[in-house]
Amino acid sequence: MITLFLILCYFILIFNIIVPAISEKMRRERAAYVNYKRLNKNFICVDDRLFSYNFTTSGIKAKVAVDNKNVPIPCSEINEVNNNKDVDTLYCDKDRDDIPGFTRSCYRAYSDLFFTT
């Protein structure tokens, strides 16, 4: 009888720890998806660079707007870039040594999407 009681207490303890963690993760993912949909394929300013997001089979990928020389476009040109749907972009899934601070800006773009409160 005591064994059954201990097993029951164990499951109650586990569910009290796991279920709130799962619901918090789901809440954050929903908030990130709402932020993604609110952007509506427009670019946002992160570290004086323009970023946008694509929803792919592997999840949400950040991409930075670049000119024809692969130099990130500054935030001062956000209106021109949002109006021009034919802008070149580089995805953040690969490291770029030719662009200083590229990885840090990509990390910040992801954190701005997922961890805004």
Swiss-Prot record:
Q: Which residues cross the membrane?
A: 1-21
Keyword Transmembrane in annotation: yes
Gene Ontology cellular component annotations, sorted alphabetically: membrane; viral envelope; virion membrane
Topology relative to the membrane: Single-pass type III membrane protein
Q: How is it modified after translation?
A: Contains two intramolecular disulfide bonds. They are created by the viral disulfide bond formation pathway, a poxvirus-specific pathway that operates on the cytoplasmic side of the MV membranes.
Q: Which UniProt keywords apply?
A: Disulfide bond, Fusion of virus membrane with host membrane, Membrane, Phosphoprotein, Signal-anchor, Transmembrane, Transmembrane helix, Viral envelope protein, Viral penetration into host cytoplasm, Virion, Virus entry into host cell
Annotated InterPro entries: Poxvirus_A21 (IPR007987)
Q: Where in the cell is it found?
A: Virion membrane
Residues in the Virion surface compartment per record: 22-117
Gene Ontology process terms (BP): membrane fusion involved in viral entry into host cell; symbiont entry into host cell
User: Self-association or partners: how does it assemble?
Assistant: Part of a stable entry-fusion complex (EFC) which is at least composed of proteins OPG143, OPG147, OPG155, OPG086, OPG094, OPG107, OPG104, and OPG099. Formation of the viral membrane is necessary for the assembly of the complex.
What does the protein in this record do?
Envelope protein part of the entry-fusion complex responsible for the virus membrane fusion with host cell membrane during virus entry. Also plays a role in cell-cell fusion (syncytium formation).
**Per the similarity annotation, which family is this?**
Belongs to the orthopoxvirus OPG147 family.
The entry's protein name is Virion membrane protein OPG147
Q: Which organism is it from?
A: Variola virus (isolate Human/India/Ind3/1967) (VARV)
